[in-house]
């Protein structure tokens, strides 16, 4: 990202990928798919994404999943924690609960009880 024009182009490409991620957050996302959307090689995409976002693609996607899961915990009381975990692509509720607690410092069940 040496000049302003290429930096703007890179930002536009990354924004396009971010929009795609947000629209497909509950679906499996692959590096191949996302790098193709950005029009970069996998290696270049991963490097540019981290340079712009200051977090890896995996960290970004996990953070978005956890942030969106909070709304589900509060407003989708018809869904169990396991249902929410599976909806956002976690392999099971234990993996989801561990990631949630690491990020929010509270378990998903306690979060739901405190805020719903």
Language-model features, listed with the residues they occupy:
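Short, polar N-cap/turn motifs at the start of nucleic acid-interacting alpha helices
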Residues: 82, 92-93
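Residues within the alpha-helical elements of helix-turn-helix
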Residues: 37, 87-88
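Terminal helix-turn-helix DNA-binding modules in bacterial transcription factors
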Residues: 15-32, 52-87, 115-116
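The short coil/loop that forms the "turn" connecting the two helices of the helix-turn-helix
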Residues: 40, 90-91
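Glycine/alanine-rich phosphate-binding loops at beta-alpha junctions
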Residues: 1-47
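…primarily DNA-binding HTH/wHTH and HhH modules…
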Residues: 1-8, 12, 74, 98-116
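Key DNA-contact positions within bacterial/archaeal DNA-binding proteins
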Residues: 43, 93-94, 109
